[in-house]
């Protein structure tokens, strides 16, 4: 007979049920001139956002949004936007761990796929592939929590 040391508690599980591209766009407004050799590399700005919505008690839709814009001085060289999602089954985690799982672990699992899509679309647009550096989702989550706490404090102060 096996020993049952978990006292009826279930082991935490995190699994991807589906992954999908919700929105993808690439704009090359200066083509074909933008494809010519240039003296300096364009400035690239990347914005990242993560959202999660419950689908059921255990299933969540987690969406990673990546927005990249390359500029040469004030002219847009290219602009790409990707909204990449995953349906995750998250079960057995204590309630206090749910937000970190949804906003850190789930996007960490989605990121390599989203990064590859961005690299492919920029390459297919005539540019070198844009290889986005790894993202620190833990730091992003901590910043988001701090901003929400600061916002709650401001709203709690009577006028």
UniProtKB/Swiss-Prot annotation:
Q: What is its main location?
A: cytoplasm
Write down the Gene3D superfamilies for this protein, in alphabetical order: SecB-like
Molecular function GO labels:
unfolded protein binding
Q: A biological process (GO) annotation for this entry?
A: protein folding
Record keywords: Chaperone, Cytoplasm, Protein transport, Translocation, Transport
Read off the Pfam families from this record: SecB
Under the heading InterPro entries, the entry gives: SecB, SecB-like_sf
Q: Which residues form a coiled coil?
A: none
Q: Write out the annotated subcellular location.
A: Cytoplasm
Give a Gene Ontology cellular component term annotated to this protein.
cytoplasm
Summarizing the function annotation, the protein's role is: One of the proteins required for the normal export of preproteins out of the cell cytoplasm. It is a molecular chaperone that binds to a subset of precursor proteins, maintaining them in a translocation-competent state. It also specifically binds to its receptor SecA.
* NCBIfam families noted in UniProt: PRK05751.1-3 (NF004392), secB (TIGR00809)
Q: Which family does it belong to?
A: Belongs to the SecB family.
Assembly and oligomerization: Homotetramer, a dimer of dimers. One homotetramer interacts with 1 SecA dimer.
Q: What is this protein called?
A: Protein-export protein SecB
Native organism: Rhizobium etli (strain CIAT 652)
Gene that specifies this protein: secB
């Amino acid at each position: 007979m096996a020993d049952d040391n978990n006292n009826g508690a279930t082991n935490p599980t995190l699994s991807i049920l589906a992954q999908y591209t919700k929105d993808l766009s690439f704009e090359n407004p200066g083509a074909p001139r933008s494809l010519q050799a240039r003296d300096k590399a364009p400035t690239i700005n990347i914005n990242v956002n993560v959202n999660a919505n419950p689908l059921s008690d255990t299933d969540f839709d987690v969406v990673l949004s990546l927005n990249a814009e390359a500029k040469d001085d004030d002219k847009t060289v290219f602009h790409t936007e990707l909204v990449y999602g995953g349906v995750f089954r998250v079960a057995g985690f204590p309630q206090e761990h749910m937000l970190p799982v949804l906003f850190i672990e789930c996007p960490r699992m989605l990121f390599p796929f989203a990064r590859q899509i961005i690299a492919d679309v920029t390459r297919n647009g005539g540019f070198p592939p844009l290889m986005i550096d790894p993202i620190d989702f833990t730091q992003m989550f901590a910043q988001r929590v701090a901003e929400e706490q600061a916002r709650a404090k401001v709203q709690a102060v009577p006028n």
